[in-house]
A protein has these predicted regions:
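Catalytic-core segments of nucleotide cyclases and related cyclic-nucleotide turnover enzymes
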Residues: 253-257, 290-323
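Forkhead-associated
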Residues: 57-134
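Short regulatory alpha-helical coupling segments
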Residues: 169-188, 222-230, 249
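Intrinsically disordered, low-complexity acidic Ser/Thr-rich regulatory segments
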Residues: 1-81
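A short pre-motif secondary-structure segment
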Residues: 235-238
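Catalytic strand-loop-helix junctions within cyclic-nucleotide turnover domains
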Residues: 96, 247-256, 275-278, 283-300
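Conserved nucleotide-binding and Mg2+-coordinating catalytic segments in signaling enzymes
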Residues: 154-174, 195-211, 219
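Active-site-proximal alpha-helical element of nucleotidyl cyclase-like catalytic domains
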Residues: 213-233, 243
Length: 323
């Protein structure tokens, strides 16, 4: 019979009890996990894409309406740009804390955990169920899921600018392209504002302010815009440095120019005070609206960006919406 005494073990090179080990095991105290579980209870039901179009895998959608459509139509709540997905493929139905899934007579069916569900028949979802829509695979996470809460934080970090909290450039450009395509299909207006901070380099170069002062201005500017100007359907992103973009879906050039002027005036009137020093801040704005001649988001952005530089050449602290 083999016993423990038949084995020889080398003693560990360094024990947890050695005072100068430098990497002692930390004894866990407190209720960190309890706090995480308590926070997760506030997390609504979600679906996350496991397999699908590039750029969308890992994306999380919150189920925050009583009914949500998954489909290839730009009007879908969960838009999936994949030819295997019908325009209106699947419906998610939420009642209280229970979520049901229903196939909308799609061409390629809706499959839950390897079983195709009958059309127009709601099927109750359980936590971690997998939903296949055409060739696209989602995972359902029920309310209070720790995994969904963690994924939500990861997604937010990947989409947001770490300094200001505005959406980052990658997310901005993706949203712009999606919004442009959607506006063309639905035949609705779409405008954008491109703006940057006037003489921002002087703020960074000021010995009393330096880069911390510049960072403060960027954060305060975004906070001011988000709390005073951004509507629920608007989208604010940081393009880079001190340059930002607002996407105004459904706004024509006149409406966008008015919003641009309100934006300019709000920033001019706002008091930016850093460590007791008042910093005068103004912005220059370029405005553009999608025209029938434009075929890409990049064309729309280029027009607004050109008008931004017209505002700067013409004296700064102004809005340019034509030319």
């Amino acid at each position: 019979m083999i016993t423990a005494s038949d084995f020889e073990f080398d003693p560990p090179a360094m024990g947890d009890d050695e005072e100068d080990a430098g990497e002692k095991t930390v004894i866990s105290v407190g209720n960190t996990m309890s706090k995480k579980i308590a926070e997760a209870t506030k997390t609504p039901p979600t679906i996350v894409m496991l397999e699908g179009p590039a750029g969308y895998v890992g994306k999380l959608w919150t189920i925050d309406k009583s009914e949500m459509i998954i489909g290839r139509s730009m009007t879908s709540n969960v838009f999936v740009d994949d030819r295997s997905v019908s325009r209106s493929h699947t419906k998610l139905i939420m009642k209280d804390d229970t979520v049901w899934v229903m196939d909308l007579e799609s061409s390629n069916k809706t499959v839950v955990n390897d079983d195709a569900i009958p059309p127009m028949t709601p099927v109750k979802l359980d936590d971690s169920d997998q939903i296949k829509v055409g060739n696209v695979l989602f995972k359902f996470q029920a309310r209070g899921s720790l995994e969904a809460a963690a994924l939500g934080k990861v997604q937010e970090k990947s989409e947001k600018d770490g300094l200001t909290g505005a959406f980052n450039k990658g997310t901005l450009m993706q949203k712009g392209a999606e919004s442009f395509k959607r506006s063309k299909l639905l035949k609705v207006d779409m405008s954008i504002l491109v703006f940057d901070i006037d003489f921002f380099k002087k703020i960074n170069d000021n010995p009393q302010l330096g880069h911390p002062g510049g960072d403060f201005v960027l954060k305060e500017l975004v906070k001011t815009i988000q709390t005073k100007l951004i509507r629920s359907d608007d989208f604010l992103g940081r393009y880079g440095g001190e340059e930002f973009v607002v996407i105004l879906f459904g706004s024509n050039i006149t409406q966008a120019a008015e919003i641009g002027e309100r934006l300019r005036k709000t920033i001019e009137d706002h008091e930016f005070v850093y460590q007791g020093l008042k910093i005068p801040v103004t912005i220059s704005v370029g405005v553009a609206t999608k025209s029938p001649e434009m075929s890409t988001w990049e064309e729309l952005f280029a027009v607004a960006d050109q008008r931004l530089y017209m505002s700067k050449r013409n004296g700064r602290n102004r809005v340019t919406s034509e030319g």
